[in-house]
């Protein structure tokens, strides 16, 4: 009989955020990486590439100079303290979390299709409601007209990058238990 245990730091079905920095995973510098652990201590926790880079850069208290000179070959998981060996190729050779990666690709594809169509994809199955909205947009009345959609796309294109800007975390926040607990309780980005 196999016991299934829910590990609190593993991302849930709808969760696309790193549990260390609370920033959303993406297909770039915040790609979801799965820590393999060792034969003795299996890990399997998922963190973003930026947090993994920060963990690898932290020495054993060697200071900033030690961080610049070398990266550690073993990273300790901040959730279960299991050591994970870094591959020879560096952090980018660490295995991606395939489930989260596929969800991020689907999300990016949907956003691309939505941008091409100029209209966000509707997920409701109410055919009458959709027919009314289509009729309204054909008339040109209200915020569903082509002019409003074009303005909305321009607005999103101009202000979209600004929404993703967040101030960087101080380096001492990564292991601060009190701040991490507060962040978990409030689900806020610090």
UniProtKB/Swiss-Prot annotation:
InterPro entries: DUF4632 (IPR027952), RING_finger_E3_ubiq-ligases (IPR051435), Znf-RING_euk (IPR027370), Znf_RING (IPR001841), Znf_RING/FYVE/PHD (IPR013083), Znf_RING_CS (IPR017907). One of its GO terms (molecular function) is zinc ion binding. A zinc finger (RING-type) spans 18-81. Keywords: Metal-binding, Zinc, Zinc-finger. One of its GO terms (biological process) is protein ubiquitination. Residues 111-145 are annotated as: Disordered. Pfam families: DUF4632 (PF15451), zf-RING_UBOX (PF13445). Residues 126-136 have a biased composition (Acidic residues). This is RING finger protein 227. It comes from Homo sapiens. The gene is RNF227.
